[in-house]
Amino acid sequence: MKLAHLGRQALMGVMAVALVAGMSVKSFADEGLLNKVKERGTLLVGLEGTYPPFSFQGDDGKLTGFEVEFAQQLAKHLGVEASLKPTKWDGMLASLDSKRIDVVINQVTISDERKKKYDFSTPYTISGIQALVKKGNEGTIKTADDLKGKKVGVGLGTNYEEWLRQNVQGVDVRTYDDDPTKYQDLRVGRIDAILVDRLAALDLVKKTNDTLAVTGEAFSRQESGVALRKGNEDLLKAVNDAIAEMQKDGTLQALSEKWFGADVTK
């Protein structure tokens, strides 16, 4: 009898431990990144800060641009503030991996390869890869084949570099870890063309007093989304819900019209 009683006690003890363990696991799972962001009161956003019109320093020295304002509005919809973390592109995803930032908002193109490692929000801009040349050389590049034999500048580790290496043979690929140097090399003739976001290209032509020019049609369709570490479904859902709200209430279109003079969100 005593043995039976002890057996029942042992069984009840095991069940109690299992129940507590189960509750602990559930509680830990519920403590996701979204909760941490809300407890902190800030969303840590990685962006370049040297990539007009998306993110750059204004005359007052403060960061401004389409993606700066988008990040601020996104954070507002989450009930927090955006803490902007300027980072060079070639180290930005590493910063995301190491949890120094929560998200990347930097015209990150959604691709099958990137989706293997990162989660992406629904797209918030639609664009394409555009060739930009020195003013007067517009006729030199009309199609991707015209890039053959030319010195073409691209951001190091960007989808522009990936696309160029995969789709054009016989091109002299020059990589850059910052945009100003790339633009300067194009102006002085060290390279023949650069590949950039179509939206950035149109803005850049205006800001450089027409010393540069867009040439040919955009080479491919690009959808950009907010990049997150995998496994943070709570924050991903909140970001997607916020983007949907911004599309519905007109916030996203208003930002697009302000910075590009057109709706580039669809």
Swiss-Prot record:
The TcyJLN system is inhibited by L-cystine, L-cysteine, DL-2,6-diaminopimelic acid and L-cystathionine, and is stimulated by D-cysteine. PROSITE patterns: SBP_BACTERIAL_3 (PS01039). It is found in: Periplasm. SMART domains: PBPb, PBPe. InterPro entries: Iontro_rcpt_C, SBP_3_CS, Solute-binding_3/MltF_N. The keyword Signal applies. Residues 1-29 form the signal peptide. GO terms for biological process: cysteine transmembrane transport; diaminopimelate transport; L-cystine transport; sulfur utilization. It holds the Pfam family SBP_bac_3. Keywords: Amino-acid transport, Periplasm, Signal, Transport. One of its GO terms (molecular function) is ligand-gated monoatomic ion channel activity. GO terms for cellular component: ATP-binding cassette (ABC) transporter complex, substrate-binding subunit-containing; outer membrane-bounded periplasmic space. It comes from the Bacteria. Induction: Transcription is controlled by CysB. Expression is highly induced by H(2)O(2). Induced by sulfate. Also slightly induced by exogenous L-cysteine. Disruption phenotype: Disruption of the gene significantly impairs intracellular uptake of L-cystine. Mutants show a higher sensitivity to H(2)O(2) than wild-type cells. The tcyJ-tcyP double mutant is unable to import cystine and is completely resistant to both L-selenaproline and L-selenocystine. The double disruption of eamA and tcyJ increases cellular levels of lipid peroxides. Part of the ABC transporter complex TcyJLN involved in L-cystine import. This high affinity cystine transporter is involved in resistance to oxidative stress by forming a L-cysteine/L-cystine shuttle system with the EamA transporter, which exports L-cysteine as reducing equivalents to the periplasm to prevent the cells from oxidative stress. Exported L-cysteine can reduce the periplasmic hydrogen peroxide to water, and then generated L-cystine is imported back into the cytoplasm via the TcyJLN complex. Functions at low cystine concentrations. The complex is composed of two ATP-binding proteins (TcyN), two transmembrane proteins (TcyL) and a solute-binding protein (TcyJ). Belongs to the bacterial solute-binding protein 3 family. PANTHER family: L-CYSTINE-BINDING PROTEIN TCYJ, MEMBRANE-BOUND LYTIC MUREIN TRANSGLYCOSYLASE F. This is L-cystine-binding protein TcyJ. It comes from Escherichia coli (strain K12).
